[in-house]
């Protein structure tokens, strides 16, 4: 049922996007006041202006249709792209189910996605301008990866990886290391180097995570937990970075760096390890406390109703 599917995806992807950006819209002036944002451009600082009521309302309405966003909610591009990808795929599959086979559809869709991805990557023509305007720079690359996943589900790919764990682990690890020196992927802005580079990086990255997960129950549990609570990470990822920046500025005071540095103080030193860990752990901790509090309040309500 396509309608039910759309409703389900709206609840799990669209609604979190709107609520997260609503939170950062409401708190924008407060964050400006305490220095998390700044009106002045500086070292790694993207200036933010105060919001009046009309500007805030306009921003909220824009977020309802996936337009715009907030600086600290930058990671929510993933929710927007995944929603559009899954809905487009579901609708097209439904409309074409009696016209062409699914294999034919996947092949055509992959060709279109690959062309679109390369055009966006190279900033070619009106397609690049259009996707930038509506904030879907990552759509074609994400759709391409989504289709790869659909294909792999129909193969014995996972079984092959299980049977050749060590060789696949070494291949994926060394391969990703070499690719890191060749180019980089910035999916949020549609930069993928080229189609082959993106496809190979995606496959090798998946193999590495899969092998590590199946050989460690603890890591598998962690990956599963992170996956089930990823909305908290997407929502609070960049805000959590401010914890690291704040501690760094206490230890190493620098006049040319402020708390408003975005997304991080420096990108090319070991601080990225702290940013990565805090950017995941802090949101998960907030989510854990929230769910515990919600469960407690719910149990108290049930207790009062039964008293």
Regions found by a protein language model. Give the residues of each.
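Alpha-helical transmembrane segments and their immediate juxtamembrane cytosolic regions
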Residues: 1-307
């Amino acid at each position: 049922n396509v309608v039910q599917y759309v409703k389900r995806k709206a609840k799990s992807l669209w609604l979190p996007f709107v609520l997260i950006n609503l939170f950062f819209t409401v708190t924008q002036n407060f964050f400006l006041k305490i220095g998390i944002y700044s009106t002045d451009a500086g070292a790694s600082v993207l200036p933010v202006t105060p919001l009046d009521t009309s500007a805030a309302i306009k921003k909220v309405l824009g977020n309802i249709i996936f337009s715009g966003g907030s600086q600290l909610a930058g990671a929510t591009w993933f929710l927007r792209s995944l929603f559009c990808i899954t809905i487009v795929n579901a609708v097209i599959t439904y409309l074409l189910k009696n016209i062409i086979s699914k294999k034919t559809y996947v092949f055509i869709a992959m060709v279109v996605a690959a062309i679109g991805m390369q055009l966006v990557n190279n900033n070619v023509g009106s397609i690049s301008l259009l996707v930038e305007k509506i904030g879907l720079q990552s759509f074609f690359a994400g759709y391409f990866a989504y289709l790869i996943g659909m294909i792999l589900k129909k193969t014995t790919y996972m079984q092959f990886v299980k049977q050749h764990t060590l060789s696949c682990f070494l291949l994926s690890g060394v391969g990703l290391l070499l690719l890191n020196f060749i180019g980089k992927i910035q999916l949020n802005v549609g930069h993928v180097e080229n189609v082959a580079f993106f496809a190979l990086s995606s496959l090798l990255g998946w193999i590495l995570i899969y092998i590590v997960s199946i050989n460690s129950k603890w890591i598998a549990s962690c990956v599963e937990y992170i996956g089930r609570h990823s909305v908290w990470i997407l929502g609070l990822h960049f805000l959590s970075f401010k914890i690291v920046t704040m501690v760094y500025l206490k230890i190493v005071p620098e006049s040319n760096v402020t708390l408003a540095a975005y997304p991080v103080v420096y990108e090319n030193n070991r601080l990225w390890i702290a940013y990565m860990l805090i950017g995941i752990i802090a949101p998960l901790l907030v989510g854990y406390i929230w769910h515990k509090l919600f469960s407690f309040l719910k149990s108290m309500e049930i207790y009062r109703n039964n008293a």
